[in-house]
Swiss-Prot record:
Class in the EC hierarchy, top level: oxidoreductase
Obligatory cofactor(s): FAD
An annotated Gene Ontology molecular function: L-aspartate oxidase activity
GO cellular component terms listed in the entry, alphabetical order: cytoplasm
Catalytic activity: L-aspartate + O2 = iminosuccinate + H2O2
Protein name listed in UniProt: L-aspartate oxidase
Source organism (scientific name): Listeria monocytogenes serovar 1/2a (strain ATCC BAA-679 / EGD-e)
Pathway assigned to this chain's UniProt record: Cofactor biosynthesis; NAD(+) biosynthesis; iminoaspartate from L-aspartate (oxidase route): step 1/1
InterPro entries per the UniProt record, alphabetical: FAD-dep_OxRdtase_2_FAD-bd, FAD/NAD-bd_sf, Fum_R/Succ_DH_flav-like_C_sf, Fum_Rdtase/Succ_DH_flav-like_C, NadB, Succ_DH/fumarate_Rdtase_cat_sf
Gene3D superfamilies membership: FAD/NAD(P)-binding domain, Fumarate reductase/succinate dehydrogenase flavoprotein-like, C-terminal domain, Succinate dehydrogenase/fumarate reductase flavoprotein, catalytic domain
Note on how the cofactor is bound: Binds 1 FAD per subunit.
Subcellular location field: Cytoplasm
Length: 484
């Protein structure tokens, strides 16, 4: 019997979860732009938020998620996240996933805007790496297509039936399937300062848009408050869990920054902390994390410690880490239902590239990994309810190409996006930026031109959404508006 084919674009936790739940009965292929180890999931430090402790409940997790999201979240999506979260965690543990423990119980960390500790972690601050590796090692019966950049979703009779890709030598490869799942992550590389992997440049968002998928809430981009900052450049994330363990944000003179800003001070929602730090930096102040209150810092955060040592940060002596906000996570994305379905038959989206309404205007810390797990399970459950007979498709060529495209320099584009669509925004600047974008073409005959084109399309979608939302909300901060 010929198996139905599932094509998954993206090698992170959401795509790997879906693949794991489908591989026994489906012909599953994972396509990834780089190597399978290169994803935002591998970089995730903090952990997975889930109501698994005796003192916690899904209702409390629901409340924290909604408040952090400025009540812009969708009720059913958040309810699915927080109620299925504990079950997904127990399933993983039963399958052999080992989360950190303390005194025989799960060790739970505290992060911003959570009312109590509920963050499961492993390897201290290397949860994403350990969890992604755990899932990938279980994928014993799938096809991996590494170093293949997806450049076009193939449609027939208004349904998605495949993906065109380019390899490192810009040779075209085509993969057909009855189910196409986008799990390609967000858009961090649109910005010059980001926590994201080098491969994350809005590809899936642009592909979906060009295919006719609906995208929503694109103006809501979370900027993480604390990236390691040195000599004008950022060198990786300093997890929010560091503040959860007691670190404080301070100025060079040692004065506290967040004390009078929000009742939760250093553990306020990320949009508030990032905007506050950005204002400090705009005023000419350097910003640091004071880790004096964490005596076991090196043991609790081995990954961060290694990164600090690699960049010769004298944190053991100074108890300070220089930090700066940077692009971290897209709350919006491809509109989906609770099963990951888009408005295009045969096309699904899960993880950061998708927007089921879980995060609202600002994501609650460590809800991202939970989302990847829950929605990876849900899309697999739905696909299992569908019966589609596999058919051979006639070879469908790549859409018409512009032979001599006019595209901007990537660094210039990143700088303009940061100036226009960064932590604070001005409507007149956004209008100018949209006009500037009209000078350029779309092209995808090489990986380089395809990536810049995807960045242009994604930036345009963000700018248009930002201009439509005339008042500030969550991570979207229009300077003339009132921040809610």
């Amino acid at each position: 019997m010929i198996k139905e084919r599932v094509i998954i674009v993206g090698s992170g936790i959401s795509g790997c979860t879906a693949a794991l739940r489908l591989m026994q009965d489906y012909d599953v292929t994972i396509i990834t732009k780089g190597y399978k180890e290169e994803s935002n999931s591998m970089l995730a430090q903090g952990g997975v938020a889930a109501a698994v402790s005796k003192n916690d409940t899904p209702k409390k997790h629901f409340s924290d998620t909604f408040q952090a999201g400025c009540f812009h979240n969708k009720v059913l999506a958040v309810n699915q996240l927080v109620t299925h979260g504990p079950m997904v965690i127990q399933k993983l543990i039963a399958e052999g996933m080992a989360f950190d423990e303390q005194d025989g119980e799960l060790a739970l960390g505290l992060e911003g805007a959570h009312q109590l500790p509920r963050i499961l972690h492993t390897g201290g601050d290397q949860t994403g790496k350990f969890l992604t590796t755990f899932l990938q090692e279980k994928l014993t019966d799938i096809h991996w297509q590494e170093q293949k950049m997806a450049i076009e979703i193939i449609k027939q009779n208004d349904s998605a039936i495949g993906v065109h890709c380019l390899d490192k030598e810009n040779r075209l490869h085509t993969y057909y399937g009855e189910h196409i799942i986008l799990a390609s992550g967000g858009l961090g590389q649109l910005f010059p300062v980001t926590t994201n992997a080098a491969t994350i440049s809005g590809d899936g968002l642009a592909l979906a848009y060009r295919a006719g998928a609906k995208l929503t809430d694109m103006e809501f981009i979370q900027f993480h408050p604390t990236l390691l900052f040195l000599n004008g450049r950022c060198h990786g994330l300093i997890s929010e869990a560091v503040r959860g363990e007691g670190a404080k944000l301070i100025r060079a003179d040692g004065s506290a920054i967040m004390t009078d800003v929000h009742p939760r001070a250093d553990l306020a929602p990320r949009d508030i902390v990032a905007a506050t730090l950005f204002a400090e930096i705009q005023d000419g102040n350097e910003v640091f994390l004071d880790i004096t209150a964490i005596p076991n810092f090196e043991k609790r955060f081995p990954g961060i410690t290694a990164n600090l040592d690699a960049h010769h940060i004298p944190f053991r002596e100074t108890k300070r880490i220089p930090v700066h906000p940077g692009a971290h996570f897209l709350m919006g994305g491809i509109r989906t239902d609770l099963s990951g379905k888009t408005n295009i038959p045969g096309l699904y989206a899960i993880g950061e590239v998708a927007n089921a309404g879980v995060h609202g205007a600002n994501r609650l810390a460590s809800n991202s990994l939970l989302e990847t797990l829950v929605f990876g399970e849900k899309v697999a459950e739905y696909i299992r309810t569908q019966k589609i007979n596999p058919i051979d498709h006639p070879e469908i060529p790549l859409s018409n190409q512009i032979q001599t495209p006019h595209l901007p320099d990537k660094q210039l584009l990143q700088e303009k996006i940061w100036e226009t669509l960064g932590i604070t925004r001005k409507p007149e600047k956004i209008t100018e930026f949209l006009h500037w974008l009209t000078d350029f073409d779309y092209a995808n005959h090489t990986r380089k031109t395809a990536e810049i084109s995807h960045m242009l399309i994604t930036a345009k979608l963000i700018a248009e959404s930002a201009l439509k939302r005339t008042e500030s909300l969550g991570a979207h901060r229009i300077l003339k508006g009132v921040i809610k």
